[in-house]
Amino acid sequence: MPKMKTHRGSAKRFKKTGSGKLKRSHAYTSHLFANKSQKQKRKLRKGAIVSAGDFKRIKQQLANIK
């Protein structure tokens, strides 16, 4: 059986935290900021943790990420 390759698109989008969870950035942060409130833009700056439902699939794609 060949080795599992890391999904490079996922590797660029997710980082593993110290406790083993996966951190992601928010969507809606690339353009069209004039239509968004200051509160929404401020909340989008912070990272978020990947939900439990998506965690298993993404973890499999990032098999070799330390």
From Swiss-Prot:
<dbReference type="Pfam" id="PF01632">
    <property type="entry name" value="Ribosomal_L35p"/>
</dbReference>
<keyword id="KW-0689">Ribosomal protein</keyword>
<dbReference type="GO" id="GO:0003735">
    <property type="term" value="F:structural constituent of ribosome"/>
</dbReference>
<dbReference type="InterPro" id="IPR037229">
    <property type="entry name" value="Ribosomal_bL35_sf"/>
</dbReference>
<keyword id="KW-0687">Ribonucleoprotein</keyword>
<protein>
    <recommendedName>
        <fullName>Large ribosomal subunit protein bL35</fullName>
    </recommendedName>
</protein>
<comment type="similarity">
    <text>Belongs to the bacterial ribosomal protein bL35 family.</text>
</comment>
<dbReference type="InterPro" id="IPR001706">
    <property type="entry name" value="Ribosomal_bL35"/>
</dbReference>
<dbReference type="InterPro" id="IPR021137">
    <property type="entry name" value="Ribosomal_bL35-like"/>
</dbReference>
<dbReference type="GO" id="GO:0006412">
    <property type="term" value="P:translation"/>
</dbReference>
<feature type="region of interest" description="Disordered">
    <location>
        <begin position="1"/>
        <end position="45"/>
    </location>
</feature>
<dbReference type="InterPro" id="IPR018265">
    <property type="entry name" value="Ribosomal_bL35_CS"/>
</dbReference>
<feature type="compositionally biased region" description="Basic residues">
    <location>
        <begin position="1"/>
        <end position="26"/>
    </location>
</feature>
<dbReference type="GO" id="GO:0022625">
    <property type="term" value="C:cytosolic large ribosomal subunit"/>
</dbReference>
